[in-house]
C-alpha cells in the first residue's frame, strides 16, 4: 500500500475529488494548508493583477503563503500510477503553482471501528 499525498490549488479541489471518485477512490483526507514554492507567493493564484510597485513591496516584506489543499489517499500498490495520472490530469495547467505529489509506503492500515487490517480496512 502507498500513501499518495498531493498539494493542489483550492479551486481544483472539486474536479480532483470528482476525478478520483470516477476511478473508485472516494475516501481521502483533505486539509486546507498554506505554502510557497517557485511562485514565491505572487502568482495569479490570488486572481489579481500585480503592479510593479506591489511586486517590489511584496519582495521587500517577505514572501506570503498561498492557500492550497493537501490530499492524502491510501491506495493499493497497483493503483498508484492511475491515481497519480488522475491527479495530474485535472490539476496540470503548466503554470507555476500547480502543486506536488508525494508517494510513501504504508506498512499497515487498521480500521478503528472494526479492527480490520490491510486492504480490508481500505474498502
Curated annotation (Swiss-Prot):
An annotated GO cellular component of this protein is:
cytosol
The answer to whether keyword Transmembrane helix applies is no
What's one GO BP annotation on this UniProt entry? regulation of nitrogen utilization
Q: One GO MF term, please?
A: enzyme regulator activity
Gene3D superfamilies recorded: 3.30.70.120
- Keyword set for this entry? Nitrogen fixation, Transcription, Transcription regulation
* Alphabetical list of Pfam families matching this protein: P-II
**Which protein family is it in?**
Belongs to the P(II) protein family.
PANTHER family from the UniProt entry: NITROGEN REGULATORY PROTEIN P-II (PTHR30115), NITROGEN REGULATORY PROTEIN P-II HOMOLOG (PTHR30115:SF11)
Q: What does this protein do?
A: Could be involved in the regulation of nitrogen fixation.
Name of the protein this chain belongs to: Nitrogen fixation nifHD1 region GlnB-like protein 2
Species of origin reads: Methanosarcina barkeri
Amino acid at each position: 500500500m502507498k500513501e499518495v499525498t498531493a498539494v493542489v490549488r483550492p479551486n481544483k479541489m472539486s474536479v480532483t475529488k470528482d476525478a478520483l471518485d470516477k476511478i473508485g477512490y472516494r475516501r481521502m483526507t483533505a486539509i486546507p494548508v498554506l505554502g510557497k514554492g517557485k511562485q514565491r507567493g505572487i502568482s495569479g493564484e490570488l486572481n489579481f493583477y500585480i503592479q510593479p510597485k506591489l511586486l517590489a513591496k511584496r519582495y521587500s516584506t517577505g514572501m506570503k503563503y498561498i492557500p492550497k489543499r493537501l490530499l492524502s489517499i491510501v491506495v493499493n500498490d497497483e493503483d498508484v500510477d492511475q491515481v497519480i495520472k488522475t491527479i495530474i490530469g485535472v490539476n496540470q495547467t503548466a503554470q507555476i503553482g500547480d502543486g506536488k505529489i508525494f508517494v510513501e509506503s504504508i506498512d499497515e492500515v487498521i480500521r478503528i471501528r472494526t479492527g480490520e487490517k490491510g486492504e480490508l480496512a481500505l474498502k
